[in-house]
């Protein structure tokens, strides 16, 4: 059919694409130790599995935990691409106390608090202030990354942990997986996963 972008591929919910994904996942199944992300990171830290599909924040945790027991782990984004994810704070439309929720979000988005939260959970904050960038620079690292996509043009060559902040070139080969706005598409994918995992 010609070339498709990573975004088109990741958001293709056609019957044909879901069937192909199911076929490939079933072929891989004998080599899969588990499907749950938390299970994989635990197994990685113990040196019991060699590869895991995981979110970068979980990878940070696993790398740190594994290092404590002498297991060396790394985190890479496939050349073919991956998904871009981001976490943020939101207020549901049915919230009872919007004012309190707003205060909480404002508190969590203060750079000093965002940094403490990042250190506690391993995930990057949506806050992109100079204070966050300065705190994340690690001059002991050999590689420089272009983070201008996140922190602005002044961050085009900085020493940061690439697990938490991938280089701009890595981000270019990734895409956002959109939410399922069509319930039928969501149901098709859930049913496919059920068949792959053997739930039915």
Model-derived segments and their meaning:
Residues 1-74:
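Ligand-binding pocket segment of bilobal, Venus flytrap-like solute-binding proteins
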Residues 13, 17, 32, 36, ...:
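Extracytoplasmic/periplasmic, Sec-exported soluble proteins
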Residues 1, 22-26, 41, 45, ...:
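Non-transmembrane alpha-helical segments in soluble domains
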């Amino acid at each position: 059919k010609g070339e498709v972008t990573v975004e088109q591929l990741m958001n293709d919910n056609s019957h044909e694409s879901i069937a192909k994904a199911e076929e490939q996942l079933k072929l891989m199944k004998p080599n899969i130790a588990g499907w749950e992300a938390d299970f994989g990171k635990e197994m990685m830290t113990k040196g019991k599995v060699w590869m895991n599909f995981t979110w970068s924040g979980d990878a940070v945790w696993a790398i740190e935990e594994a290092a404590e027991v002498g297991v060396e782990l790394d985190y890479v984004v496939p050349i073919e691409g991956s998904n871009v994810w981001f976490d943020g704070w939101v207020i549901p439309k049915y919230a009872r106390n919007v004012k309190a929720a707003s205060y909480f979000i404002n508190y969590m988005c203060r750079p000093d608090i965002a940094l403490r939260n990042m250190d506690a959970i391993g995930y990057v904050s949506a806050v992109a202030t100079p204070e966050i960038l300065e705190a994340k620079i690690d001059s002991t690292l050999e590689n420089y990354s272009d983070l201008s996509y996140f922190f602005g043009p002044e961050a085009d060559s900085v020493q940061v942990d690439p697990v938490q902040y991938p280089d701009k070139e890595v981000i270019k080969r990734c895409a956002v997986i959109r939410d399922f706005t069509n319930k039928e598409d969501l149901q098709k994918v859930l049913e496919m996963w059920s068949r792959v995992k053997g739930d039915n």
